[in-house]
């Protein structure tokens, strides 16, 4: 697994700036897991499901934390303040994200370019991007004081991810 990850890091060195570190840890690990499982004879679809299940299990503790945070009436305004700052520090090479102006009780972000899609497509696994999109759905779809809305996701065939959080 480590050897595969080292090869992937080398092959995707343009993405390895410090801002992309957290994304690449998840992305390249899942890609390497699929590659290793395939090399051991597991069909790709099963290998991808194995990686997806591991990721979904990993985020389970975050769901409770997110719901607790979103139980506050100020949650959407908090996102408006913190998310643009966070992404300025964590979106590196390969990302194109904008934060359109919106009403007081909404926060929107539009992702035009996503490194998950770019890298998974490069390795012939664009369907893996949808697995990461599902993480957003899992974390944000059932929040107590905010609706998580979108009309499209890059990983599910859209031209962008147009996410909006609207206060309930």
Outline where the language-model segments fall.
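Amphipathic interaction/junction segments at domain boundaries or subunit interfaces
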Residues: 25-123
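Short, flexible segments with low predicted structural confidence
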Residues: 4-5, 111-113, 134-135
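N-terminal, charged low-complexity regulatory/assembly segments
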Residues: 1-37
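Compositionally biased, intrinsically disordered low-complexity regions enriched in proline and serine
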Residues: 16, 57, 94-96, 151, ...
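Generic intrinsically disordered, low-complexity segments enriched for polar/acidic and small residues
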Residues: 18, 53-55, 113, 137, ...
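C-terminal non-catalytic interaction appendages of large macromolecular assemblies
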Residues: 105-108, 118-119, 126-168
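Short, contiguous strand/loop micro-motifs
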Residues: 20, 123-125
């Amino acid at each position: 697994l480590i050897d595969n990850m080292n090869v992937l890091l080398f092959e995707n060195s343009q993405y390895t700036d410090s801002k992309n570190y957290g994304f690449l840890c998840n992305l390249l690990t899942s890609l390497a897991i699929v590659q290793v499982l395939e090399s051991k004879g597991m069909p790709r679809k099963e290998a991808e499901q194995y990686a997806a299940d591991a990721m979904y299990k990993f985020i389970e503790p975050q769901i409770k934390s997110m719901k607790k945070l979103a139980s506050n009436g100020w949650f959407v305004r908090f996102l408006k303040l913190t998310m643009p700052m966070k992404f300025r520090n964590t979106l590196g090479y390969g990302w194109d994200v904008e934060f359109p102006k919106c009403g007081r009780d909404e926060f929107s972000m539009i992702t035009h370019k996503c490194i998950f899609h770019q890298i998974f497509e490069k390795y012939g696994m664009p369907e893996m991007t949808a697995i990461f999109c599902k993480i957003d759905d899992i974390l944000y779809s059932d929040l107590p004081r905010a609706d998580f809305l979108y009309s499209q996701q890059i990983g599910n065939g859209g031209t962008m991810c147009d996410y909006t959080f609207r206060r309930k």
